[in-house]
């Protein structure tokens, strides 16, 4: 069974890891959406989240399971089951911060997997620009929480779509296609 967001957060914090669960999910998602297919994801994770030090043994398994679960949901393009690993907190301001954290680490991950990402044009280039804007998502504590929640829901769906766009673009031939029934 996949570890819960809060349990993963606690384990990362206890181990002194520089990422929270949301950032970890964003980073791993970025690597996968960027087309990384080998085992280099683990050394990259250690490098960018733990000063090149391996994670404690007890943390490697849940992180690997998370990586595999993200990979599986991304490959199911038709099912669109991929979800952003955002905080479970119901507070809309906390969720907005979580989305910004996820997007920041997603861009880092995809940038590592696709070093020429900044040169992409068209849909991909626009999506990169949009994600950079989302990373700087701002709000005022006086903002109407209901309106912010609605806007945030739309942005989250858009980011899910962007992730799937990147995955489809950089992982051609890897996408699971279901047979067409006649």
Curated annotation (Swiss-Prot):
GO cellular component, one term: cytosol
SUPFAM superfamilies assigned: YgfB-like (SSF101327)
Intrachain disulfide bonds: none
Top-level taxon of the source organism: Bacteria
NCBIfam families in the cross-refs: PRK01736.1 (NF002477), ygfB_yecA (TIGR02292)
Family classification: Belongs to the UPF0149 family.
Name recorded for this polypeptide: UPF0149 protein HI_0817
Organism: Haemophilus influenzae (strain ATCC 51907 / DSM 11121 / KW20 / Rd)
């Amino acid at each position: 069974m996949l570890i819960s967001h809060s349990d993963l957060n606690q384990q990362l914090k206890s181990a002194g890891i520089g990422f929270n669960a949301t950032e970890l999910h964003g980073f791993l998602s970025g690597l996968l959406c960027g087309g990384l297919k080998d085992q280099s994801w683990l050394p990259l994770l250690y490098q960018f989240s733990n000063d090149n030090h391996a994670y404690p043994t007890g943390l490697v398994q849940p992180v690997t399971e998370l990586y595999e679960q993200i990979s599986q949901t991304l490959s199911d393009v038709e099912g669109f089951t991929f979800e952003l690993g955002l905080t479970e907190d119901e507070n809309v301001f906390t969720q907005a911060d979580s989305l910004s954290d996820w997007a920041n680490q997603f861009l880092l991950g995809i940038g590592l997997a696709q070093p020429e990402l900044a040169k992409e044009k068209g849909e991909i280039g626009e999506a990169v620009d949009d994600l950079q804007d989302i990373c700087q998502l701002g709000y005022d504590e006086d903002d109407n929480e209901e309106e912010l929640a609605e806007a945030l829901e739309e942005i989250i769906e858009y980011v899910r779509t962007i992730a799937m766009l990147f995955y489809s673009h950089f992982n051609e031939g890897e996408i699971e296609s279901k047979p067409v029934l006649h």
